[in-house]
Structures are given as structure tokens and as C-alpha cells.
From Swiss-Prot:
Gene3D superfamilies: 3.30.300.20. Residues 124-162 are annotated as: Disordered. The keyword Transmembrane helix does not apply. It is found in: Cytoplasm. This is Ribosome-binding factor A. HAMAP family: RbfA. GO terms for molecular function: ribosomal small subunit binding. The gene is rbfA. One of several proteins that assist in the late maturation steps of the functional core of the 30S ribosomal subunit. Associates with free 30S ribosomal subunits (but not with 30S subunits that are part of 70S ribosomes or polysomes). Required for efficient processing of 16S rRNA. May interact with the 5'-terminal helix region of 16S rRNA.
């Protein structure tokens, strides 16, 4: 019987082990700037997907996603060994590394929201100078303070007849 709470605990532990191993133990220059973001473990505890993101050397540099993916593939065996030693489970999960695209999605959503705000501002600018096409209320009878009913009469008997 799958235990989702156990899978979450194992994912959290794998996340910690892999992140600290990349930072302190594995000396691959391709892993510089790699940050482990999240880990998901299947319910049967046999597969773990580790999500990572890559930062550039400076703010202006584009991250090297290809080098980071290649370095993670090279280090996959050593990382799995460390996960097995650090978790103490009967079967060490297979590690799969996937680039986290959340930041790309956030940037895209920010761009779409900025475009929507600009379109709203243009519409408000156009709307501010607009006037109704005709009278303000073309159905109102002039001179009379009371509006006629559906049949043209003035009174409280405007209820539908059944």
C-alpha cells in the first residue's frame, strides 16, 4: 500500500542529500551554479525526480543548461550511492534530473500581465474621451417625471397577467 507521507519524507531527505553533495562533495565545475529546487518520489519509492535550476556566473551571463545536465548525468551514480547511504531504505530510488522551468513560466506570466496592463491603459485612454452614440437615455419621455409601464399606462398594475 503506497504511503504518500513516507514518499514526501523520502523526497525531502533526497533533496537535502543531493543538494549538500553537489555543494560540498562533488567537485565537478559543470555543477557550479546548480541549485536543487525540489524532489518528487513515486508512491512505490522506486523513482525520484530531482528538479534543478542553473544560475549564470554573473547577472548578465546566460546559464549553461547543457553543461549542468551533462554534469548531473556524470554524477548520477555517485549521488545515488550517497542517497542510498543517507536514507537507509531497502531500495535506493533511481534518480532522474529535470530542469525546473518555474522561473521561465513566471517570467512569461509577468510579460503577459504587463501586456494586459498596457492594453487596459490604452482602453481606458480611449474610453475617457468616448461619448454615448445618441441621447443618454433614448427611452425616457421628456417632461414626465414618471416612467410609463409596459403597456404605456402609468400605475402599479404592471404585473404580468396569468
Amino acid at each position: 500500500m503506497p504511503d504518500p507521507a513516507r514518499a514526501r519524507r523520502l523526497a525531502k531527505r533526497i533533496n537535502t542529500i543531493v543538494a549538500s553533495a553537489i555543494e560540498f562533495e562533488i567537485k565537478d565545475p559543470g555543477l557550479d551554479g546548480v541549485t536543487i529546487v525540489d524532489t518528487k518520489v513515486t508512491a512505490d519509492l522506486h523513482d525520484a525526480t530531482v528538479f534543478y535550476t542553473v544560475m549564470g556566473r554573473t547577472l548578465d551571463d546566460e546559464p549553461d543548461y547543457g553543461a549542468a545536465a551533462a554534469a548531473l548525468e556524470r554524477a548520477k551514480g555517485a549521488l545515488r550511492t550517497m542517497v542510498g547511504a543517507g536514507t537507509g531504505v531497502r531500495f535506493t530510488p533511481t534518480l532522474t534530473f529535470t530542469r525546473d522551468t518555474t522561473s521561465d513560466s513566471v517570467a512569461r506570466m509577468d510579460e503577459l500581465l504587463a501586456r494586459a496592463r498596457a492594453a487596459d491603459a490604452d482602453l481606458a485612454r480611449v474610453r475617457s474621451g468616448a461619448k454615448p452614440a445618441g441621447e443618454a437615455d433614448p427611452y425616457r419621455e421628456s417632461g414626465s417625471g414618471v416612467e410609463p409601464g409596459r403597456d404605456g399606462s402609468i400605475g402599479d398594475d404592471d404585473q404580468p397577467e396569468y
